[in-house]
Amino acid sequence: MASNKFLGQGLTYDDVLLVPAYSETLPREVSLKSRFSKNIPLNIPVISAAMDTVTESKMAIAMAREGGIGVLHKNMTIEEQAIKVRAVKRSESGMIIDPVTLPETALVSDANLNMQQYKIGGIPIVDSNKKLIGIVTNRDLRFEKNKNRPIREVMTSKNLITVNEGTSLQDAEQILQKHKIEKLPVVSKDNTLVGLITFRDITKHFTKPNANKDKYGRLRVAAAVGVTSDVLERVETLNNAGVDAIVIDTAHGHSKGVGVVVKKVKNQFKELDVVVGNIATADAAKYLVDIGADAVKVGIGPGSICTTRVIAGVGYPQLTAIIEVSKALEGSDIPIIADGGIRYTGDIPKAIAAGADAVMLGSLLAGTRESPGETVIYEGRKYKTYRGMGSVEAMKMGSKYRYFQDVEDDFKKLVPEGIVGRVPFKGDLNESIHQFVGGLRAGMGYCGAKDINALKKNGKFITITSAGIRESHPHNISVTKEAPNYSPS
């Protein structure tokens, strides 16, 4: 067999350890700021995966509040995905610049529907010229039994408290407290509604200072699209809803079809960052950057629920893949996202030292309260369902496009590249993020890295044997109390 058939040895996270170095940096002093894509920053280098048991609006909101970003999955209609984008963008803001409004001809039922759909507690009422004429809150509707009653009969219109454009959050907070109200409409000189400030948003602004927000103070969110005939329609709808970035999400990003879609999207939506994946080689990375990708996503088969490597016989050990892609993109200013294979918090600094700017997590987030997976009880313990987007169940819901099987209508003929399982329930996301960030900070402290770029530039590895792996884990002892950030697997 020709020697050029073998490209060398491939390593993954368990095959290496980071080498400790002289340090003048304490873990609590390091900066975790990084990038999701060329123009989208991160305050922590953690991203939730575009999977239908991982990221919907609740997860995306929670991720952005912690400083990361969530990628909404595509297994839903275009409008459903856009609604979830708007839910994230409206969940909190310094000032909501496009608040949900209703005309004075609306009914109580219309207000109830909008409050439920967008998870909001108040709606400004405007006339045909967008002039503010009142506001209705959930307190106005709480005991209203006549759902067909006109909204103008229940809204607050007299002595309406408003502020002018340019009012600071500090001043707005004082006005809200003085008048004991929770919603403060912002109007122009001619009383045109231009925004809405809420007490809840002000509180979150000060309690979550690390939140990842856009220039308007809204939480950031990304959304996945596929190589499909309606991709431009989907991207346009998502863009109009306020999405911060698009992820063109396929199992094999180094392909002609992906290239065609990337060029179309970048040509029509020049202001929108486009992340493209998945890939695993230097050639693939160069290809995606040449066609306009604003970030690349690395990972062919490393995920815990992915069977691509054993079904198709194709893949690339994740650590080596990140290193190869990083070398290929050196000097390009294109961020690299390491997608899949993260089992322990220590794998995060390994991925970054290999060249990644951020990691994308699936299984480690699927057990949190904010994930959309079903909660189940098994043998007295609580779990949440978690499935690969290549599983038959997910492909039936729409992800078959990701594996280039979108022309197959007979579900029995689908060739899955993923499985369905369950993961232990972990509670609130912020508790898990605290452990992930703590492990990363510790790793950076050991390596003397004051920020993400320093870890990428100076991190060094040593390969270890199977004996080294055993030595790395607790051994020669029976664990009697589980740690919050470790479980044997």
Annotate the PLM regions.
Residues 28, 77-86, 144-148, 192-212, ...:
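Active-site-adjacent beta->alpha loops and helix N-cap segments on the catalytic face
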Residues 72-77, 120, 124, 132-147, ...:
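Short beta->alpha transition motifs characteristic of CBS
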Residues 1-22, 102, 164, 171-174, ...:
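Alpha/beta catalytic cores of nucleotide-metabolism and tRNA/nucleoside-modifying enzymes
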Residues 28-42, 49-51, 80-118, 125-127, ...:
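Bateman/CBS regulatory modules and CBS-like beta-alpha motifs in cytosolic regions of diverse proteins
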Residues 65-80, 189, 243-255, 294-312, ...:
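Glycine-rich phosphate-binding active-site loops on the catalytic face of alpha/beta enzymes
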Residues 58-61, 233-241, 274, 280-298, ...:
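Catalytic cores of alpha/beta
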Residues 72-75, 101-102, 122-124, 162-163, ...:
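Catalytic beta/alpha-barrel core
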Residues 41-48, 94-99, 214-224, 266-280, ...:
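Short beta-strand/loop segments at the ligand-binding rim of alpha/beta enzyme cores
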